[in-house]
UniProtKB/Swiss-Prot annotation:
This protein's encoding gene: ligA
EC number(s) from the headed UniProt entry: 6.5.1.2
Record GO terms (molecular function): DNA binding; DNA ligase (NAD+) activity; metal ion binding
Signal peptide: none
Organism ancestry: Bacteria, Pseudomonadati, Pseudomonadota, Gammaproteobacteria, Pasteurellales
Function, as annotated: DNA ligase that catalyzes the formation of phosphodiester linkages between 5'-phosphoryl and 3'-hydroxyl groups in double-stranded DNA using NAD as a coenzyme and as the energy source for the reaction. It is essential for DNA replication and repair of damaged DNA.
Protein name: DNA ligase
GO biological process, one term: DNA replication
Length: 673
């Protein structure tokens, strides 16, 4: 018996130590190692044991306090009124139990309860003190009793007023709220960090917490932080409204930001409707939330209900299903996207996350695999938010099994066996078999027949879908091998449509070298670059055999584009398809290099608008490109010339308003003469 009691006592102490460790990682180091759901499970396990064995209760247990101790780097601030956390509900039944506890304490209240309902922002709780309307101090929640002085950092947040917008400010007003970062701001912050080679943040909450705890306020000021107030602590020299909702509206009226989704809900069903609505809107809000906060609206009733040691009795956080969970990485497969991007896909032990069972998650690229230091067999943290593809955001390395296997990134495409290429400085590796890779086939063919490439009118996107799905076309060269009988077997393809398609294919065999190069779909080789390559090398053979150094001598061809071109030609599959295309009769006239004299249009940004009667728009564009012009599709202050044909519309009007040089078709032709 004694041994059993000893083991229970030991289990309780181990749980306390484990929870303290994770609190320190989360609150102090801003480096959470487990999902919130895992922490909640450990917390409730400890709480249940302490309730079952009260003789082992301890005032220092994680269940008896709000959070972790503050950092020693900041001055400490004692909260006059403790900043408590909230009890959690994870189901309707939990919420009903919360309501019953309230009703049992308010037996004299016979009307239905009214709640102030708010989204539960996933950020950092702060206290901001105003004296006579001036912001004088700000602190983190810390352990609920003592926080960290972050006044200088809070002053840098643009949506927090340094002076209240009222002519009659309170003598003292303590505003409590959540500092957070929008998803767009978070993505921009990480993108900038990547470009500078700096460490990125795992999620917006970590980014907000890390930004708010910077010792240098200038760094905080560069971060896109925001505040939403959720309550009031101290208030002196002011008569506050007698409901929570009205108090939030009053805060808003004096310049304090309040969340726009907050609603007043009368009765339990309306509260649950709010929960479901916010849950549905979650992915479109633009910021992270992990549930709703439901508060008794009447301040008098709040005071009657009071507090327990850790939380108010009049409020609860009804949390959404966990967006992060632990599971095992069983394997990694490599998928090929429509542009040839190679994406590692984690095959997971199925786990229920955010309302669905997840068995696959993206690992993004090889750099991400290295950053995570992940191996097959690892225990991983998988995250699913809204409609975003599940992803692995962390690894519990201490749980790595002895038989864990390293993840080997393939050197050849798993679909077509072409070489995989990765440009230095880029994260994404790509298959080089663009013309033959089945994974890229549809997009490669759609590009090949497009108007700016081979301009094959009779072959549209829907026809290509059918041709590929029925395995009738594998490469662009196969298009020219189609016959009428084959085409007429397809949906919505009668004799006339088949004839038109074949006629378009026959007509397209006569093209230009520039169009042909563009049609090959070499990554980074756009219409202008293709024309520059054709003009420079003059023949397909010279272009195919050009060295890396020779390619870089071409206008607009830098190191990256040159590498893309050499990767394309070094893949035997691509060379074979090009030879097949020539064998099918694709041809062009010798490249005529027009002499580019000094010309007012040379190197300028030009917009074509209206109908040109003496020259087709494509021909006009080709002339302009040979002059080194940038041909744009829209008019802006950066436009140098607008060439206006007949029936020119809004582009001509805008050019006139901006004072841009306007040329008629005849004036344009005169400059080319």
């Amino acid at each position: 018996m004694k041994q059993g009691i000893f083991m229970i006592k030991q289990q309780i102490e181990e749980l306390r130590q484990l929870l303290r460790h994770h609190e320190y990682q989360y609150h102090v180091l801003d480096n959470p190692q487990i999902p919130d759901s895992e922490y909640d499970r450990l917390f409730h396990q400890l709480k249940a044991l302490e309730q079952q064995y009260p003789e082992y209760a301890s005032e220092n247990s994680p269940t008896q306090r709000v959070g972790a101790k503050p950092l020693s780097n900041f001055a400490q601030v004692k909260h006059d009124i403790p900043m408590l956390s909230l009890d959690n509900a994870f189901s309707d039944e939990d919420f009903f139990a919360f309501v019953k506890r309230i009703q049992d304490r308010l037996i004299h209240v016979h009307h239905s309860l009214t709640f102030c309902c708010e989204p539960k922002l996933d950020g950092l709780a702060v206290s901001i003190l105003y004296i006579n309307g001036q912001l004088v101090q700000a602190a983190t929640r810390g352990d609920g009793t003592t926080g960290e002085d972050i006044t200088a950092n809070i002053r840098t947040i643009r949506n927090i007023p340094l002076q209240l917008l009222t002519d009659n400010p309170p003598a003292r007003l303590e505003v409590r709220g959540e500092v957070f970062m929008s998803q767009a701001g978070f993505e921009k912050l990480n993108k900038t960090a990547l470009a500078k080679g700096e460490k990125t943040f795992a999620n917006p909450r970590n980014a907000a917490a890390g930004s708010l705890r910077q010792l240098d306020p200038k760094i905080t000021g560069q971060r896109p932080l925001m505040l939403n107030a959720y309550g009031i602590g101290i208030a002196e020299g002011v008569e506050l409204p007698d409901t929570h909702f009205a108090r939030l509206q009053w805060l808003k009226s004096i310049g304090i930001p309040v969340n726009n989704e907050i609603q007043l809900c009368h009765g339990i069903e309306k509260v649950l409707d709010f929960y479901r609505t916010i849950k549905q809107k979650r992915s479109s809000l633009g910021y992270d939330i992990d549930g709703t906060v439901l508060k008794i609206n009447d301040i008098d009733l709040q005071q009657q209900l009071g507090f327990i040691s850790k939380a108010p009795r009049w409020a609860i956080a009804y949390k959404f299903p966990a967006q992060e969970e632990l599971t095992i990485l069983n394997n990694v497969e490599f998928q090929v996207g429509r542009t040839g991007a190679i994406t590692p896909v984690a095959k997971l032990e199925p786990v229920f996350v955010a309302g669905v069972t997840v068995s696959n998650a993206t690992l993004h690229n090889g750099d991400e695999i290295a950053r995570l230091d992940i191996a097959i067999g690892d225990t991983v943290i998988v995250r699913r938010a809204g409609d975003v593809i599940p992803q692995i955001i962390g690894v519990l390395h201490e749980r790595r099994p002895e038989n864990a296997k390293s993840i080997i990134f393939p050197s050849n495409c798993p679909v077509c066996d072409s070489v995989i290429s990765k440009i230095e400085g880029e994260a994404v590796a790509r298959c080089t078999g663009g013309l033959i890779c089945a994974a890229q086939r549809k997009e490669a063919l759609k590009h090949f027949v497009s108007r700016k490439a081979m301009d094959i009118d009779g072959i549209g996107a829907k026809l290509i879908e059918q041709l590929v799905e029925r395995e009738l076309v594998h490469t662009p060269a196969d298009l020219f091998k189609l016959d009428q009988v084959t085409l007429m077997r397809l949906e919505r393809m009668g004799a006339k449509s088949a004839e038109n398609a074949l006629a378009s294919l026959a007509k397209a065999k006569k093209t230009t070298l520039a169009r042909f190069i563009f049609a090959l779909g070499i990554r980074e080789v756009g219409e202008t670059t293709a024309l520059n390559l054709a003009t420079h090398f003059k023949t397909l053979e010279a272009f195919e055999n050009a060295t890396f150094e020779q390619l870089q001598k071409v206008q607009d061809v830098g190191e990256v584009v040159a590498k893309r071109i050499r990767s394309f030609w070094s893949e035997p599959h691509n060379v074979a398809v090009v030879k097949d295309l020539i064998a099918q009769g694709i041809h062009w006239d010798d490249v005529e290099v027009k002499e580019v004299r000094d010309n007012p249009l040379k190197g300028k940004t030009v917009v074509l608008t209206g109908t040109l009667t003496k020259m087709g728009r494509s021909e006009a564009k080709e002339y302009l490109l040979q002059l080194g012009c940038k041909v744009s599709g829209s008019v802006s202050s950066k436009t140098d010339f607008v060439i206006a044909g007949e029936s020119a519309g809004s582009k001509l009007t805008k050019a006139t308003e901006l004072g841009i040089n306007i040329l008629s078709e005849n004036e344009f032709l005169a400059l080319l003469a």
